[in-house]
Amino acid sequence: MNELRKLSIAQMHNGLKQRSFSAVELIEVHINAVENEKLNAFITKTPEIAIKAAKTADERFSQQKDSTISPLMGIPVGVKDLFCTKGVKTTACSKMLENFIPTYESTVSDLLLKSGAAMLGKLNMDEFAMGSANINSYFGPVENVWVRKSDGEKVVPGGSSGGSAASVAGFLCAGALGSDTGGSVRQPAAYCGVVGAKPTYGRCSRFGMIAFASSLDQAGVITRSVSDSALMLETICGYDNKDSTSSERPVPRFSNFINGDIKGRRIGIPKEYRMDGISEEIIYHWEKVSSDLKENGAEVVDITLPHTKYAIPVYYLICSAEASSNLARYDGVRYGLRVNADILEEMYSLTRAEGFGKEVKRRILIGAYALSSGHYNEYYEKAQCIRALIRNDFIKAFEKIDYILVPSAPTEAFGLNEKPDPLIMCINDVFTVPASLAGLPAISVPVGLSNEGLPLALQVIGNYYDEAGMLNVASVIEQNCSRIIKLNS
């Protein structure tokens, strides 16, 4: 029965439709895997919710076999612990919200559950989505299913959606919800050898998603194939009047556009992404995939995105400033942790000192400094101006090209026991942050293995609201590259 865990979402759906196996059988084998997992990917398990969804799915499939049944009906999924789930603990992996149980459902998880998906539980993450390795969780780090060949060293899964990526790579679930602020879906997907996609900013509602940086936060998905990502994205995207930034643009059936035809498409390669610190192995695969796309009929051209070098400092200034504002609500008064004290101000201070982890405190301090009266113009306003320039670089580039091909991360995953400097950690996001600042859709696709036997990935960036075309290009890359997803013994 463990073979069921290795099926794609589409294969699971076909098996359920043909009654080759029941949804209850499918879910039970995944529940058993989750109960025995050693990756620390799941922090809250919801087997009762999953079995209930499976029984409902079996009833639907026994009564109806037409195309009106959702492709996610009865499919085992995980939800990043950043999305509020009604009646199920939602912590953002912080001591501050250790015992918080929401009274409402986030829009994207609600859409997923209404499609019939079976939620196996809530997934580990960096605290309040602040991190690039999933080592900043109150509930402990997540382990990657892949290990270094030379020494058997465990490696990080990436972050902040490390639990989402590790659970999918480890065949604990077929797909997972994640969030992407500066690359938190794409970078862990790259490290874990799976597919991670974020849509255009505004495609998915942010209602019920615990805020980190509101102008950057966007829901995304992690799966084991591009076609599976398309199925999940078309389920969770759509207008929501509860989110003022939600787009009213119609959402096409993304999966219908995956046909492998990219003839005449212009693919841009930005020269600024060939920077110091990028591994030779990444460069090799970048050039190889570019050549493959040419053979498939695409035109590959050099482009320039001149303000790329400012993306990392601009991103960390803006996201830290927004985080300092968003996290001001955690004061021990309304909900979450409270540390009692005789004086109100002391209660605020003690609560936040105990409730927040080191990385969250660091970013709050950076953000508060950037927003302070003496530095607002010097830092925050300038960062917003340069963000506009970065966005304009992309707009100008897309006047002449259709898609952009860049690495997802500069290197393979680093060791779990390594303790890199926070500044070094920032560099891990160097290739994902620009698309986030511009609000563009992007997808990370595994393209091969390093000499250490660890996954390497490239990223396709699409124009605004062109997720369908982006997914199609990604599917061609996926087909051209040898399949690297396997259970790592």
UniProtKB/Swiss-Prot annotation:
Q: What class of enzyme is it?
A: ligase
Q: Which GO terms describe its molecular function?
A: ATP binding; glutaminyl-tRNA synthase (glutamine-hydrolyzing) activity
The EC number(s) given in the record are 6.3.5.7
Q: What Pfam families is this protein classified in?
A: Amidase
Catalysed conversion reaction: L-glutamyl-tRNA(Gln) + L-glutamine + ATP + H2O = L-glutaminyl-tRNA(Gln) + L-glutamate + ADP + phosphate + H(+)
Q: Which GO terms describe its cellular component?
A: glutamyl-tRNA(Gln) amidotransferase complex
Give the matching InterPro entries: Amidase, Amidase_CS, Amidase_dom, AS_sf, GatA
Question: What keywords does the record list, in alphabetical order?
Answer: ATP-binding, Ligase, Nucleotide-binding, Protein biosynthesis
**HAMAP family, per the entry:** GatA
Q: Which protein family is it in?
A: Belongs to the amidase family. GatA subfamily.
Q: What is this protein called?
A: Glutamyl-tRNA(Gln) amidotransferase subunit A
What high-level taxonomic lineage is stated for the organism?
Bacteria, Pseudomonadati, Pseudomonadota, Alphaproteobacteria, Rickettsiales
- Gene assigned in the entry: gatA
